[in-house]
Amino acid sequence: MEQTPDLAQFFNPRSIAIVGVSTRPGSISGQFLAYLTRFGYKGQIYPVNPRHQEVAGRPCYGRLADIPDNVDLCLIVTPKQAVRATVVECAEKKVPYVVIPAAGFGEAGPEGAKVQEELMAIARTSHMRLVGPNCMGFINFKERVALSFGGFLADVENLAGGNVAFVSQSGAFGGGMVRRCLKEGIGFTYHVSTGNEADLDALDFMEYYIEDPDTRVIGAFIEGIKDASRLVAVGRKARLSGKVIVVLKGGKSARGAQAVGSHTGRIAGSADVYRGIFAQAGMIEVASARELSAALETLSQVNFAPPCYAVAAVVASGGSGILASDYCEVLGLSFPELSQKTQSALSSLVPEAGSCANPVDITAQVPHNEIQKLPSIIDLVCKEEGVGVIMLSIANLHLERCWREVLEIVGASGRLLAVGSSGGLSGPTRRELAKSGRAIVGEDVWDALQKVAFVVKRQGLNHKTEWLAPSVRCGKHDHHALPAPAGGVLTEHQAKRLLAPYLQMPRGKLASSIGEAVGIADEFGYPVVLKLVAPGLLHKTESGAVKLHIDSPDSLAKSFAELMERAPAVAGQLHGVLVEEQVERGTEVILGFLRKPELGPLVMFGSGGILVELIRDVSYRSLPAGREDLAGMVRETLSYKLLRGFRNQPAGDVEGLLDLMTEASALFLANPWMKELEFNPIVVLPAGRGVRALDVVLTT
């Protein structure tokens, strides 16, 4: 379904019918009813089951049609064999929303997928929206609507609200994450489990969360997506709305992707692909459930920006100081040495055995015997102009005695306080620090600094200009559909002849004899390159089908003859020998395009040449992509260091490279018959001298 609905009625239904409700203790349907009742749902609940007259003190109806009133939402908890018939009843009753927890549909194989599509056909014709199948429902914390099941709510006393909204394609993971966050004091606005996403999907709910005024941070567990370009649009919409999406992706490894396929029927893309798409969308990607909860906690509580994010550590242990320095480097945080002026002022307060540089090592003496000095030490560090974050690591027993004064000093200076002590602060102290909005509390030094890094990432995204840029710039040419050649892989000569009017490539012509080849070389000028051209001949270097550095007619004749001797072993139907002008040396990169059914068109960039598959230095984006998106790809790779000029080598023509990337992107989008398009290598010449695509593989 194309248009995302207003989900306000879904999250806050005036009436809910539970079809298939059971009186059996501990049943899934019974848990749905119990949680709705226990957490204070204010609307009408209609149990439906022909076997019962009454359920939990409520009248039970034999059929959905017997309910005398309108039903805003129907929860179907029947066996899967009865789900289709119940969906038909929902359509006849004009129920706008249906939730289907049952498994055994699209994730279970072709037969299940067929039934799932039948459910969707019914929903489409009746303008009904589905959540699931294979889901665990949802929770509206603001209105206390707990339409869910499972043990994750068993010991939750009340649905305390907050500013985090969560969506999970895995029901069990989502429930576990909600439970974990609630125990850590993180409050929610909404949580939904989307399951197979036959209709409404994670992006639909993210869009609703973005519009919700009470939601500041959106968390997501994603196994796979249907439309990468839409994910990018949703992520950017969130950033423009002042909100951030934190995402944990499951199914990154080959085995993980296989598990995703069996779990929900999705095809999971590689980690590299999703990493690039999340970056393009302005989402913060995390690597574990622990990181996810840490990011949600931090970003929901800290909502101000210090003057900078350079870290100064005040520690009572040399080991903690060493770790702080190491961790800052890993996390990309600046850890500057303090000025001589600050160090001189600190020397009268810091014990002789300590250190006044960064980290400031106050030793065990200050916490144990001179705790009254700590606020003054913190005050001096806060006055350091190039510092924005104060990382404090002392035993919690001592911090409990002075944290209010420390927080007041740090807050007054406009800095951010990060507490990274081993063990945990008392609950009240932790809550007070969190409530301030100017402090981060970590279980240890790493935890505290990683949380600082999350704030830095959010701030960096806030300053990105490409969020306001158009999604794609078509380049210098008005690209129209090119004539689609016959299916399969084009030869290099065919592909270059098709693309040469739009992209920078070496001049080249096809020769069938030594005489023709010499004539072409005389036209271009030496040196030249010779390549065998034949259908299916892709990796010419490995096949011995290319000759370089040919600088004379005699050398050309010899190389031509050697290639013709080689041809029967590597080329079936030989089209000839491609004679090209040889391009001077430069930085070699790869640029590729592909279409994935579950993601749409993608662009890939990285270090090129014959080692591309070995070093895997690549970055991805979804198409369409603007010039700034493409520039971000380039900056993410190791090749960018070479392009900027490495070890006295001249800087490469990055602007020329971006011109080619933009043109090629527009060409690929304008011609859906192109399944894959790869340029490897592209030689980036020194700044101002352009680029050349030396080899092309085009698959139709």
Spans of model-derived segments:
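Catalytic-core regions of core metabolic enzymes
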Residues: 1-700
